[in-house]
Amino acid sequence: MRWTFLSTCSVNVAILTLLIGCQSDQDAIGPAGDCLVQSSVTNGQAIAGSYIVTYKSTENLPVAPNARVGAAVQQLLTRHGLNDPNAQVLFSGESTGFLAHVSAAEAETLKADPSVELVEPDRIISICSCVDVAVTSTLTWNVKQTGYGRGDLNPDKTAWILDTGIDLDHPDLNVDTGRSQSFLTGKTADDENGHGTHIAGIIGALNNNIGVTGVASGATLVALRVLDNEGEGKLSALVQAVSYVNTNGKAGDVVNISIGGEGTSASLERVIKQAADKGILFAIAAGNEGESAEKYAPANVNHANVFTVSAMDQSGNFASFSNFGPTVDICAYGVRITSTYLNGRYASLSGTSMASPHVAGLLLIRGRTIPTNGFVKNDPDGTPDPIAGGE
């Protein structure tokens, strides 16, 4: 399974250009002149001795992981003669998921237990982020053409951003630091990469006559950090972050995921659908491989409250890097998008990573009935995706 961050580089007039080592996509050259960066040699690799285990709880365990859930996990391990004092609970409820540090043979032993529903290796996930730090326009063309509103008029709704974190003190963002969380040991939710901050601005940058304005301006943003400053992290952290939203979020909240990988993850699909069943809405990037999104997770998750988003340019042409196919629900702008960035700055990026938060913003202000405005041109699958936004 190949995991990647779903942005590519945009070439634009810039004050400063930053190149960050990342996973990029072979066919990602698009209308923006997107740059290619050598893939991380570790991206997508299984982590030796680390497995995500999901089992059916024999008792009614609390939804939020606690000491009681941890004790139940240890009982399961002990039953098979396994000792893992560092086993980490990822989610709980009707089923419990945990990260087990065991050998491949021991993982097979757990898989044979009738109460165990799933055992899959934990994997490294990583990003692509080539960035131009750019001069800004308060109301950018992409937000104007998508449509925008007052996210701050819906303070009971939250945008949960699962990414590299958010620049917590960026003057153009309304970040709820109290609920923000890092799923990386020894790290805070503060962004050290820039990608998550860029997504946050597209969703909810303040309409304050500085910088840029988001689709749902002033929306409450929560940073759930699953990737480090180099843009690498673990699948298990992403699963844990979605479970955190399921526990702490509510119907009408919106989750943006601009991380994806080749293949499927049953653990990730399970927790996404559990949250979606509660009425939590998801905007998920389709991916940048120029292939069918059916081959990539979580873009291939199907649910009434999950929206997989392809990308187009300013002229309404399908971006050449964007994934396509029947699992894609809607298309949004994803080429040369200017938004917030690290250290109070602004930057221009391209990718389905940038398309997804346009839809997330609309979900916040309009609910799951997203307005559309025609269809994207030159969709490779022959069935043009509806364009998000408009009147």
Residue ranges and their predicted role:
Residues L18-G21:
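C-terminal motif of bacterial Sec signal peptides marking the signal peptidase cleavage site
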Residues Q23-Q26:
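Bacterial signal peptide processing site
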Residues G30-S129, A251-D253:
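Inhibitory N-terminal propeptides of secreted protease zymogens
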Residues L36-Q38, Q75-V89, S95, K111-T158, ...:
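Protease zymogen maturation seam
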Residues S129, G186, V212, E232-L235, ...:
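Substrate-binding/specificity loop regions of serine endopeptidase catalytic domains
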Residues Y148-R179, K187-A237, K250-D253, V301-N305, ...:
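Subtilisin-like serine protease catalytic core
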Residues A200-I203, V222-D228, V254, S320, ...:
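Hydrolase catalytic cores
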Residues A216, A241, N248-V271, K278-I280, ...:
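C-terminal subdomain of the subtilisin-like protease fold in secreted/lumenal serine endopeptidases
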